[in-house]
């Protein structure tokens, strides 16, 4: 259990999630004076304490109530869950939300010159991985018997070093696999970063702060996914244009000076294919179309 009055959050000290976690807190208005030599940092403007730890330590810290919150990759979280379940250990936590960074996939990869016919090719193969529990679950579901070789780093070198016939490792772009003469053949798990909370209830003050942070995180993520669009539109095309621009709320419609046939339209939209959308807007008679990024948003 935590004894501090501060909300205690565990973050990855180094690695692929560290920078994104720090940036998320910054965008949420949490001001932290980071010191690379210290493993504990404090917010200047909120009662928040940050513990900077190894990523695979974060699930256990949350499960055991040492920290109140943790940001962790879903792959690490589920790997730890499966391991604890296999040992008959109790697991309790709350998953608050998936975050919009840390995207990757856990994949099987083989020598790039090897022919691949399907997952049955791995029968009785030696597979090197840092995620033995996720790999075992997948192979059990496929009915494939194999031998797992546990490596905690540099998994890609296992085939060339004669340690394994294949690997199961995290993939983002695939460049590391290619550089080591490997090719991706099966995706076994898709992952993003997520925010988790200890199962034991927090104090009213801490829970209120968690709720504030969740609202801000939602605003940051919505802003990143949305655009603020301003345009001039023919009045007789408003229905079609509104349907083309799915908004968070109804659009704002304003009259135009000296133009009774057209109006100004403002909308916050999550439309992604925007070049195609702009071309369609033009075909509908829209003009002066402006697309602006949104820094923060509370819907």
UniProtKB/Swiss-Prot annotation:
It holds the Pfam family HisG_C. It is an enzyme of class 2 (transferase). It is found in: Cytoplasm. Its main location: cytoplasm. Feedback inhibited by histidine. Signal peptide: none annotated. Keywords: Amino-acid biosynthesis, ATP-binding, Cytoplasm, Glycosyltransferase, Histidine biosynthesis, Magnesium, Metal-binding, Nucleotide-binding, Transferase. The keyword GTP-binding does not apply. GO terms for cellular component: cytoplasm. It catalyses: 1-(5-phospho-beta-D-ribosyl)-ATP + diphosphate = 5-phospho-alpha-D-ribose 1-diphosphate + ATP. Its cofactor is Mg(2+). Pathway: Amino-acid biosynthesis; L-histidine biosynthesis; L-histidine from 5-phospho-alpha-D-ribose 1-diphosphate: step 1/9. InterPro entries: ATP-PRT_HisG_long (IPR020621), ATP_PRibTrfase_cat (IPR013820), ATP_PRibTrfase_CS (IPR018198), ATP_PRibTrfase_HisG (IPR001348), HisG_C (IPR013115), N-reg_PII-like_a/b (IPR011322), N-reg_PII/ATP_PRibTrfase_C (IPR015867). The keyword Glycosyltransferase applies. GO terms for molecular function: ATP binding; ATP phosphoribosyltransferase activity; magnesium ion binding. One of its GO terms (biological process) is L-histidine biosynthetic process. PROSITE patterns: ATP_P_PHORIBOSYLTR. Its EC number is 2.4.2.17. Catalyzes the condensation of ATP and 5-phosphoribose 1-diphosphate to form N'-(5'-phosphoribosyl)-ATP (PR-ATP). Has a crucial role in the pathway because the rate of histidine biosynthesis seems to be controlled primarily by regulation of HisG enzymatic activity. NCBIfam families: hisG, HisG_C-term. Belongs to the ATP phosphoribosyltransferase family. Long subfamily. This is ATP phosphoribosyltransferase. It comes from Actinobacillus pleuropneumoniae serotype 7 (strain AP76). The gene is hisG.
């Amino acid at each position: 259990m935590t004894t501090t009055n501060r909300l205690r959050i565990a973050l990855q000290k180094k690695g692929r999630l560290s920078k994104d976690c720090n940036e998320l807190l910054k965008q949420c208005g949490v001001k932290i004076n980071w010191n690379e030599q210290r493993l504990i940092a404090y917010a200047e403007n909120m009662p928040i304490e940050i513990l900077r730890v190894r990523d695979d330590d974060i699930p256990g810290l949350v499960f055991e109530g040492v920290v109140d919150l943790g940001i962790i990759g879903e792959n690490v979280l589920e790997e730890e869950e499966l391991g604890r379940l296999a040992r008959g250990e109790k697991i309790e936590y709350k998953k608050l939300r998936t975050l919009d960074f840390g995207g990757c996939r856990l994949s099987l990869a083989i020598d790039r010159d090897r022919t691949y016919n399907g997952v049955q090719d791995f029968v009785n193969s030696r597979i090197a991985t840092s995620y033995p529990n996720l790999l075992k679950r997948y192979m059990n579901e496929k009915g494939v018997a194999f031998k797992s070789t546990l490596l905690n780093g540099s998994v890609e070198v296992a085939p060339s070093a004669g340690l394994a016939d294949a690997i199961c490792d995290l993939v983002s772009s695939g460049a590391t696999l290619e550089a080591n003469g490997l090719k991706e053949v099966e995706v076994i798990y898709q992952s993003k970063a997520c925010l988790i909370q200890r199962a034991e209830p927090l104090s009213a003050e801490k829970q209120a702060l968690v709720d504030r942070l969740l609202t801000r995180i939602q605003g940051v993520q919505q802003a990143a996914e949305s655009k603020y669009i301003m345009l001039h539109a023919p009045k007789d095309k408003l229905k079609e244009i509104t349907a083309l621009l799915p908004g968070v709320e109804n659009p704002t419609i304003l009259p135009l000076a000296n133009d009774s046939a057209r109006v100004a339209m403002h909308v916050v939209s999550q439309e992604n294919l925007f070049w195609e959308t702009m071309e369609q807007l033009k075909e509908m008679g829209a003009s002066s179309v402006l697309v602006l990024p949104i820094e923060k948003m509370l819907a």
